[in-house]
Amino acid sequence: MAVGKNKRLSKGKKGLKKKVVDPFTRKDWFDIKAPTTFENRNVGKTLINRSTGLKNAADGLKGRVFEVCLADLQGSEDHSYRKIKLRVDEVQGKNLLTNFHGLDFTSDKLRSLVRKWQSLVEANVTVKTADDYVLRVFAIAFTKRQANQIKKTTYAQSSKLREVRKKMIEIMQREVSNCTLAQLTSKLIPEVIGREIEKSTQTIFPLQNVHIRKVKLLKQPKFDLGSLLALHGEGSTEEKGKKVSSGFKDVVLESV
């Protein structure tokens, strides 16, 4: 028995049970809103304890990062292997206004790309956008068979791989530094940068499965409420965003 403990005083009345309080009665639900860059702006809901005294619920919500499948944001299963990170920057009533925080591939997609008899090329670069966001962009590519090739393997020489990697870094720096974060998001959805790398490296070595596999946000500028509201539209109540074009059109020949 513990020293100084009186069993008679600590014993409660028989038959009385402790009142069970549902913890959800002290919590509020908030709607997560994605930027208008994505077609579906309703990401989901999250909860937090209500504001009590000096503790404000909005302070606990700002900075939260949510990972969402791009297929849910775009309404297309073609993007199911990519994950988007959204960060809460502002609370408006029951709506959480988010901004782009990063991009990543699912592990099963990355494993499905790696095969034998081909060379893997990876490149990454740290670059600042036009609106002062510092990002680290990772690209991945694989060599493919050349036209009229008989040999089974498509391994590239180290010198060729260095040239391809240099070209990949050059294109990523150019494409990211000349646009804002919102414009970059519009490029990442239809994979404009990957197609540009594949097109530009044809003269060095033909590539396939060229993707921007990861984007990490390293540093962000001072928070600007005006730019965030512009990113979400004036009222920020629309459920649909604008559709991002793929950037190319099929050409139909009149005569063959």
Curated annotation (Swiss-Prot):
The entry's keywords: Acetylation, Cytoplasm, Ribonucleoprotein, Ribosomal protein
N-acetylalanine modified-residue sites: 2
InterPro entries found in the cross-reference section: Ribosomal_eS1, Ribosomal_eS1_CS, Ribosomal_eS1_euk
Record's GO cellular component terms: cytosolic small ribosomal subunit
Keyword Zinc recorded: no
Gene Ontology biological process terms in this record: translation
Subcellular location, record wording: Cytoplasm
Entry's Gene Ontology molecular function annotations: structural constituent of ribosome
Family under the similarity heading: Belongs to the eukaryotic ribosomal protein eS1 family.
Subunit field text: Component of the small ribosomal subunit. Mature ribosomes consist of a small (40S) and a large (60S) subunit. The 40S subunit contains about 33 different proteins and 1 molecule of RNA (18S). The 60S subunit contains about 49 different proteins and 3 molecules of RNA (25S, 5.8S and 5S).
Protein name (record): Small ribosomal subunit protein eS1
UniProt source species: Candida tropicalis (strain ATCC MYA-3404 / T1)
